[in-house]
């Protein structure tokens, strides 16, 4: 039985550390589900980079499919799935852009080729051929030769402020444990169990 208390972030931290300790590959990889202006859903895998200021932070291109979806409808759903230890964590909340200073600080830690790629790629747009992207990478490598690569204005982070977090624990006979935290109007958390 999962020991539920008042702080879902403590539970998340404990379970993430457990997944890493058990060598779950890319334990910080999560699905991010968004919905566009027509109500069409889309999902992709991204990396959780930090948990801070009461939210879950990931990065990407603001002009990408996910960026446009979030601009239109900032309510998103995140999901971590660790089948080797029979656990999932589902997070529903509102995605907000983080500060430019936070995005700058993280961008500075990225590998140089990843920094160049953020300039070269028109993420989610149609491209004529793979060599087109290679040429753009070469162009930006030349442009920033011998310089620190600055963060592009169209690239940065989002922080998902959760309204609900579900911790799912797989059990035999599909009688799984589902422990729910829901945000209350006073900023606290209501906890309850949900039927599997």
UniProtKB/Swiss-Prot annotation:
Its EC number is 1.4.3.5. The keyword Calcium does not apply. Its cofactor is FMN. It catalyses: pyridoxamine 5'-phosphate + O2 + H2O = pyridoxal 5'-phosphate + H2O2 + NH4(+); pyridoxine 5'-phosphate + O2 = pyridoxal 5'-phosphate + H2O2. PROSITE patterns: PYRIDOX_OXIDASE. Substrate binds at residues 49, 106, 110, 114, 174-176. Pathway: Cofactor metabolism; pyridoxal 5'-phosphate salvage; pyridoxal 5'-phosphate from pyridoxamine 5'-phosphate: step 1/1; Cofactor metabolism; pyridoxal 5'-phosphate salvage; pyridoxal 5'-phosphate from pyridoxine 5'-phosphate: step 1/1. Keywords: Flavoprotein, FMN, Oxidoreductase, Pyridoxine biosynthesis. Binds 1 FMN per subunit. FMN binds at residues 66, 88, 123-124, 168, 178. One of its GO terms (biological process) is pyridoxine biosynthetic process. GO terms for molecular function: FMN binding; pyridoxamine phosphate oxidase activity. Catalyzes the oxidation of either pyridoxine 5'-phosphate (PNP) or pyridoxamine 5'-phosphate (PMP) into pyridoxal 5'-phosphate (PLP). Homodimer. This is Pyridoxine/pyridoxamine 5'-phosphate oxidase. The gene is pdxH.
